[in-house]
Amino acid sequence: MSTEKDYVVADIGLADFGRKEITIAETEMPGLMSCRAEFGDAKPLKGARITGSLHMTIQTAVLIETLVALGAEVRWASCNIFSTQDHAAAAIAAAGVPVFAIKGESLEDYWVYTDKIFQWADGGLSNMILDDGGDATMYILLGARAEAGEDVLSHPHSEEEEILFAQIKKRLAASPGWFTKQRDAIKGVTEETTTGVNRLYQLSQKGLLPFPAINVNDSVTKSKFDNKYGCKESLVDGIRRGTDVMMAGKVAVVCGYGDVGKGSAASLSGAGARVKVTEADPICALQAAMDGYEVVLLEDVVSSADIFITTTGNKDVIRIDHMREMKDMAIVGNIGHFDNEIEVAALRNLKWTNVKPQVDLIEFPKGNRIILLSEGRLLNLGNATGHPSFVMSASFTNQTLAQIELFTKPGQYENKVYILPKHLDEKVARLHLDKLGVKLTQLSEEQAAYIGVSPKGPFKSDHYRY
């Protein structure tokens, strides 16, 4: 472990390897490279101090270096204890960007690193947050509430909350008033994923959001591409790398049929699995049925299926009573943001056998075993390397544009949650067409007038559902 300088990575000697993979990824990320070309000279993020909490992968390295090329100072940590690619972290650290991320880091270290990404060498404060899941944002807001005298740290509901609250208390003792100062310095946050967006909307509805936020997740070029097509490729990759199990002919259950569930079902179906879906939402359930999937109750298939994947963003989707009834060597994994979709805490008193990193065999009293991937955390990042570079280019181009928007136009946004305007969503899509050899049909003036749009777009209303 390297800790001499302003970074913490597993092995700084991996930097050259990471740099080679970053170079390859850049050729697959036309949106980010176009941002560098368009905005590099103007440096619209000059003066921005961005705290980033997002999976420290090769693709994220390209995002980080894009933000730096646009003038920002950046400090970075991963938003998941298993998702870091150590060679990517090393390459970014070697390039001079403070990064604090190790694949397989402890929860204690995770929250220490989250604190470190707010601790600038000159004692200054962050003025922007780029978040994935909302942990960096919540860290500051919880600490500020504690400083205001609210009793928010007394009753943790999980092991992770115990560790988070302990870290907040350490910072409160070391730097009284710091959380409030840091909160007040933030110009805005851009949020990557469904779970973090839900947190922001809850804060906004209660009048507790202290700065503007852009919901990057619900940009069409994020949710309909990263969430769907990204999962379509990376889910099966993670299961294969973790288990070497052949999926053709197996029965797989996908819990949830939102965008992530749709991509996951397609991923497993494409690998030859016989896919069944569970859903609480009647609209999503109808979509699943009309896409050809049997929509079932988990209780009715728990003893017969081979693979179980959670995609919901909710908690306790697969519970201990479900896992007790699973067949021997059933595979259980999650591709939603947090680890509480599967009731992993209830498994801790059983016999665990670690097979290899992020693959555990858990034995129940009656003798049946399950294969748990990434301890219930994101298996596509824990057991594999996440989504491909091309689809992440679309997501991260949205992040870059959102950071520019909030940082350069602070007076135009209230303390609410916003979505990037349609013309920027279409711009992100355009930036990725040439790479695929796509040719767009040009509307005539008459055609455009007939449907009430400009020949140059936007081509759809804000309420259009893609």
Swiss-Prot record:
Enzyme Commission numbers on file: 3.13.2.1
Main location: cytoplasm
Organism listed in the record: Rhizobium etli (strain CIAT 652)
HAMAP family, A to Z: AdoHcyase
SUPFAM superfamilies (UniProt xref): Formate/glycerate dehydrogenase catalytic domain-like, NAD(P)-binding Rossmann-fold domains
Record's cofactor remark: Binds 1 NAD(+) per subunit.
Pathway in which the depicted protein is active: Amino-acid biosynthesis; L-homocysteine biosynthesis; L-homocysteine from S-adenosyl-L-homocysteine: step 1/1
GO molecular function: adenosylhomocysteinase activity
Obligatory cofactor(s): NAD(+)
Binding site for NAD(+): 193-195, 227, 256-261, 279, 314, 335-337, 380
GO biological process: L-homocysteine biosynthetic process; one-carbon metabolic process; S-adenosylmethionine cycle
Cellular compartments annotated: Cytoplasm
Name this polypeptide is given: Adenosylhomocysteinase
Annotated Gene3D superfamilies: Adenosylhomocysteinase-like, NAD(P)-binding Rossmann-like Domain
Enzyme type, top EC level: hydrolase
Keyword annotations: Cytoplasm, Hydrolase, NAD, One-carbon metabolism
GO cellular component: a single term: cytosol
Binding site residues for substrate: T57, D132, E192, K222, D226
SMART domains named among the record's database cross-references: AdoHcyase, AdoHcyase_NAD
Role, per record: May play a key role in the regulation of the intracellular concentration of adenosylhomocysteine.
Catalysed reaction, written as an equation: S-adenosyl-L-homocysteine + H2O = L-homocysteine + adenosine
Pfam families documented for this protein: AdoHcyase, AdoHcyase_NAD
Similarity section: Belongs to the adenosylhomocysteinase family.
